[in-house]
From Swiss-Prot:
GO terms for molecular function: 1-deoxy-D-xylulose-5-phosphate synthase activity; magnesium ion binding; thiamine pyrophosphate binding. Belongs to the transketolase family. DXPS subfamily. Binds 1 Mg(2+) ion per subunit. Binds 1 thiamine pyrophosphate per subunit. One of its GO terms (biological process) is 1-deoxy-D-xylulose 5-phosphate biosynthetic process. Mg(2+) binds at D135, N164. This is 1-deoxy-D-xylulose-5-phosphate synthase. Catalyzes the acyloin condensation reaction between C atoms 2 and 3 of pyruvate and glyceraldehyde 3-phosphate to yield 1-deoxy-D-xylulose-5-phosphate (DXP). PROSITE patterns: TRANSKETOLASE_1, TRANSKETOLASE_2. It comes from Aliarcobacter butzleri (strain RM4018) (Arcobacter butzleri). GO terms for cellular component: cytosol. Gene3D superfamilies: 3.40.50.920, 3.40.50.970. Thiamine diphosphate binds at H63, G104, H105, S106, G136, S137, N164, Y272, E353. Homodimer. It catalyses: D-glyceraldehyde 3-phosphate + pyruvate + H(+) = 1-deoxy-D-xylulose 5-phosphate + CO2. The lineage of its organism: Bacteria, Pseudomonadati, Campylobacterota, Epsilonproteobacteria, Campylobacterales.
């Protein structure tokens, strides 16, 4: 949609139409809501001043990219947002050349812009990268690594700091407080402009040195001093919902031909009163009633997250040395209950996974028992810290990995597929997974008493109810759930246990089912005994096949020179998994029990 010839009035009408479209579709389909409503005028300004098909448009995380999708030939297709086979909820170059880069994890945008700007300079192209980044993403260290180089190179990059004073959760830390202070002094920029005019008008040519020194001294009260001292110009704060001001400011920033931060104040949920000013409830939503804002809730069993949260709270009440941390996901990981109950022992450190892990390593060294509550996909962001600061020291840190396996509508950037693969080869690390609510509760007590670093994984949503009385967790010990007479053996890990049980129920043979429990260390004694009885082994796990559960067992069979076992692993193949309803995604991968039973002859 070309909007460059539209009048201001037409643009304002379009902003209303965009909001209406987002509210209508998201109310029926679900999706990221309040952040994207707050970014409508900023997005229109970007499209008016820049060219989305030429200038690199880079949306950090891209929770706020829905208006951009609607402006780039996806208005009708927007009905399919986050649905299986439909539009992604994030920017995705496969969808449109207007989507410069895949996004989903935070704080990558400015680094991408630096790389794009370097390339533009080398290729002698007339383009300017334009970034939209939220105040929540500004808490991550990668942002300042990028700003550090950008300020040094003086490359032309325009960065819109979309400051709604809310990330997904309540904003945390000194950076957030700094930005809030800037907003509190929002009239600074006009004051500075008046002083600049006074200097130019009243100081003769020979006093430019004095004028320069005055300007340097003036920076001491500049709200953007943090950025200006890094060599990046700062404009703002501006009203991010005033289209005229947004467009004029972006035109100025583009013409400056150097790095510029445009600090825009916006309201999260703008245009839908019920959502305005809400931190978490309206960030990512399911279907809701537009008239009253009531969510259309389906009856659902207690989620694994809720079970974990209650169990960790009980553990914290029992043991005073239990502490915990999350990286900007207190509600998503369930640690919010503990932050309310024990604010001196549980922290949200904002989007700072590396810091979260290393700081908890120090607490473990001091005798505390840290629980790092984190989504599987975000644990990737602290990989070096896991090795260098936790496992090398063999410190008893517990990584509680939520959203392990397929996560549904968030898609390929958020699937919890890789944690087993990248944790399994680290010395000292213990990996285990509960199969249901009862074993999840048990696993936390076990983790507390373990003197090694360990990682527990559990899925998004609820475990399937299983009718097995759990035995106590013992390090490196599996559990036989059912003994059959077939020469086949089903081994499940974590949520994969229920898939093994369901597949066995559909099969015409009486098959033994084992809950592996530990992928590291393996129960080698039991596996050795099982290899004497069963020749065809089938592995069920919600994880990547490469270096996954099947690989661990194959390594064991090879090391023990066991050659009579034929092993088949039902894990994720070597490709990224698309978004959509979990059952539809599993069906596309051939992982439903009714599909698996056809593969087991």
């Amino acid at each position: 949609m070309d909007i460059k010839d539209k009048s201001l009035k037409e643009l304002e009408e379009l902003s209303s139409q965009i909001r209406e479209r987002i509210i209508d579709v998201v109310s029926r389909k679900g999706g990221h809501f309040s952040s994207t409503l707050g970014a409508v005028e900023l997005t229109l300004g970007m499209h008016y001043v820049f060219d989305a098909y030429s200038d690199p448009f880079i949306f950090d995380v891209s929770h706020q990219c829905y208006p951009h999708k609607l402006l780039t030939s996806r208005w009708d297709e927007f009905e399919t947002i986050r649905q299986f086979g439909g539009l992604s909820g994030f920017t995705k170059p496969k969808e449109s050349p207007a989507d410069y880069f895949v996004a989903g994890h935070s704080s990558t945008s400015i680094s991408l812009a630096v790389g794009a700007a370097k390339s533009i300079k080398l290729k002698k192209e007339n383009k300017v990268p334009i970034v939209m980044i939220g105040d929540g993403s500004m808490s991550a260290g990668m942002v300042y690594e990028a700003l550090n180089e950008l300020g040094d190179l003086k490359l032309p990059v325009v960065i819109i700091l979309n400051d709604n004073e809310m990330s997904i959760a309540k904003p945390i830390g000194a950076i957030s407080k700094y930005l809030s202070k800037i907003l509190a002094g929002k009239y600074y920029q006009s004051f500075k402009s008046k002083v600049d005019k006074f200097i130019r008008k009243n100081m003769p040519e020979g006093t430019t040195y004095l004028a320069k020194r005055f300007e340097e001294a003036f920076k001491l009260i500049t709200p953007g001093i943090l950025f200006e001292e890094m060599g990046i110009d700062y404009i703002g704060p501006i009203d991010g919902h005033d289209l005229k001001e947004v467009i004029e400011t972006l035109q100025i920033a583009k013409a400056m031909q150097k790095p510029v931060i445009v600090h825009a104040h916006t309201i999260k949920g703008k245009g839908y009163k019920i959502a305005e000013g809400q931190h978490e409830e309206w960030h990512g939503v399911g279907p809701f009633n537009i008239e009253d804002g009531e969510f259309i809730k389906k009856e659902a069993p207690k989620s694994a997250t809720a079970v974990f949260s209650d169990a960790l709270l009980n553990l914290a009440c029992k043991y005073e040395n239990v502490v915990g941390v999350t990286a900007a996901m207190p509600s998503g990981t369930g640690i919010n209950k503990l932050m309310d109950e024990f604010p001196e022992r549980f922290w949200d450190v904002a989007i700072a996974e590396q810091h979260a892990i290393t700081s908890m390593a120090a607490m473990a060294k001091e005798g505390f028992k840290p629980f790092i509550t984190i989504y599987s996909t975000f644990l990737q962001r602290g990989f070096d810290q896991i090795i260098h600061d936790v496992c090398l020291m063999n410190l008893p840190v517990v990584f509680a990995m939520d959203r392990a396996g397929i996560v549904g509508n968030d898609g390929e950037t958020h699937q919890g597929a890789f944690d087993i693969s990248f944790l399994r080869f680290i010395p000292n690390m213990v990996l285990f997974a509960p199969r249901d609510n009862e074993t999840l509760e048990q696993s936390l007590e076990f983790a507390y008493n373990l003197n090694n670093p360990c990682a527990i994984r559990y899925p998004r949503g609820a475990f399937k109810k299983l009718n097995f009385v759990p035995t106590p967790f013992v390090l490196g010990k599996a559990e036989i759930l059912k003994t059959g007479i077939s020469n086949k053996l089903f081994i499940g890990y974590g949520a994969g246990v229920s898939r093994a049980i369901d597949t066995e129920a559909l099969h015409n043979e009486d098959i033994t089912v084992v809950d592996l429990r530990f992928v590291k260390p393996l129960d080698k004694n039991l596996l050795l005994e099982l290899s004497k009885k069963y020749n065809d082994w089938y592995i069920f796990s919600d994880s990547q096949k490469q270096s996954g559960v099947g690989s661990a067992i194959l390594e064991f069979l090879n090391d023990e020179k066991i050659h009579n076992v034929q092993l088949t692993s039902f894990e994720y193949n070597d490709k990224f998994i698309e978004h959509g309803d979990t059952k539809l995604v599993e069906q596309s991968l051939g992982l439903l029990p009714e599909q698996l039973v056809q593969k087991i002859k």
